[in-house]
């Protein structure tokens, strides 16, 4: 229906007992097998502070891939998550580019699938975000939604990188990214920025 092929379930850190998620997944499998089969993964059902909430989640990840999102602040937490039963990692450049790269490297070295998500990255933030997704193998492309929620915020950048700020058949186009500085092409973007806080 509506051409949907894949789904995910994001509990947004609201669950403390794996049995709750297991029950939902088991009921879906029993009562709505088509929906169950479309579900790629379950995302972050449990509290984001993984160190304070070391919940064994192997029973959930035995049913569906279980992705860390809010908990995946750095590679050390990804390591802890894997020990607890998490099977995948959502990377976000807004948690720092370096942190996302290190988490990606650790996860890849331990056969954990990746996805790249955003928090509605507008303007220049969109560029390193999509570049990360282009260079780490993800399970389903990249989540990018700033053009959906506030399209006008990125108008100066979209004039230079139109394919990055407008989806076409579910895809963004990275072909205009080139040159130094993440390929931003700052000299061509007509955006007034405040003066830097620190001069080096």
Write out the residue ranges for each language-model feature.
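Catalytic core of soluble alpha/beta enzymes
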Residues: 1-120, 124-126
């Amino acid at each position: 229906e509506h051409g949907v092929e894949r789904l995910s379930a994001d509990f947004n850190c609201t669950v403390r007992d794996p049995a709750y998620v297991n029950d939902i997944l088991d009921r879906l499998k029993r009562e709505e097998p088509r929906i169950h089969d479309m579900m790629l993964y379950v995302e972050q059902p449990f509290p984001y502070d993984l160190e304070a909430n070391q919940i064994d989640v192997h029973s959930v990840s035995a049913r569906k891939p279980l992705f860390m999102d809010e908990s995946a602040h750095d590679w050390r937490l990804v390591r802890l998550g894997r020990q607890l039963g998490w099977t995948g990692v959502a990377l976000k450049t807004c948690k720092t580019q370096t942190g996302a790269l290190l988490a990606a490297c650790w996860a890849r070295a331990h056969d954990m699938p990746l996805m790249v998500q955003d928090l509605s990255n507008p303007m220049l933030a969109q560029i390193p975000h999509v570049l990360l997704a282009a260079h780490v193998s993800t399970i389903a492309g990249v989540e990018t939604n700033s053009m959906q929620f506030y399209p006008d915020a990125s108008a100066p950048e979209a004039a230079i990188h139109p394919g990055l700020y407008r989806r076409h058949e579910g895809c963004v186009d990275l072909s205009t990214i080139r040159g130094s500085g993440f390929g931003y092409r700052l000299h061509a973007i007509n955006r007034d920025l405040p003066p830097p806080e620190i001069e080096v």
